[in-house]
């Protein structure tokens, strides 16, 4: 009888430790929500404002799903061609490789993608082999003071070329809450 109680307690402790380990993997204290497909989702926030409009748009897109937020402002990322110590590009790329779905987000700065996200993308060139991210889905969030059609078209072209070069399946872009809700339908669809 005591052995059955001990085994039951051990099973309960193991289940609690497992749940604790999952919650500890969320280093950014983001709300952990259920991801029905168990795909690993990484949101790369290019905004220096970690809780700003870019993050809010990600919450709309990723509503109801578990995801990790990577704030680029928390990482040292040298510009293309710099060889300064402390660069964390390898760490960023490792996190991206571990994810099934990557959502990149940028505020509109000077009619374009913000510098931190642009730097990450530029650093791929010559460092990451072509096709390295084959099979991973890429979504883009681009928000700001009413981006014009020309700005949206230019960024859409940039993102689709980036995706093509590195093997991502580019799923599209959202610039506001309504578009993020529409893009969520693609997120919820089966892998293409």
PLM features: residue spans?
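Short, glycine-/small-residue-rich phosphate/pyrophosphate-handling segment
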Residues: 137-172
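N-terminal beta1-alpha1-beta2 submodule of the flavodoxin-like/Rossmannoid cofactor-binding fold
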Residues: 24-129, 160, 164-192
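Bacterial N-terminal signal peptides
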Residues: 11-19
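Short, glycine/serine-rich, charged loops/turns that create anion-binding
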Residues: 16-17, 48-49, 145-147
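A glycine-biased structural micro-motif
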Residues: 133-135
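Bacterial N-terminal signal peptides that target proteins for export
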Residues: 2-10
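N-terminal hydrophobic targeting signals that begin at the initiator methionine
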Residues: 1-2, 39
């Amino acid at each position: 009888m005591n052995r059955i109680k001990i085994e039951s307690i051990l099973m309960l402790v193991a289940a609690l430790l497992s749940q604790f380990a999952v919650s500890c993997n969320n280093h950014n204290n983001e709300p952990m929500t259920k991801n029905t497909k168990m795909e690993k989702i990484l949101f790369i926030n290019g905004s220096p404002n970690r809780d700003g409009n870019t993050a809010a748009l990600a919450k709309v897109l990723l509503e109801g799903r578990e995801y990790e937020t990577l704030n680029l402002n928390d990482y040292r990322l040298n510009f293309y061609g710099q060889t300064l110590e402390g660069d964390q590009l390898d760490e960023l790329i490792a996190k991206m490789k571990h994810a099934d779905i990557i959502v990149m987000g940028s505020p509109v700065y000077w009619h374009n993608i913000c510098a931190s996200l642009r730097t990450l993308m530029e650093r791929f060139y010559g460092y990451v082999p072509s096709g390295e991210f084959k099979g991973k889905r890429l979504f883009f969030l681009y928000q700001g003071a009413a981006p014009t059609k020309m700005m949206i078209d230019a960024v859409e072209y940039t993102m689709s070329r980036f995706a093509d070069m590195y093997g991502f399946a580019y799923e599209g872009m959202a610039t506001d809450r309504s578009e993020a809700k529409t893009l969520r339908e693609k997120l919820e669809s089966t892998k293409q």
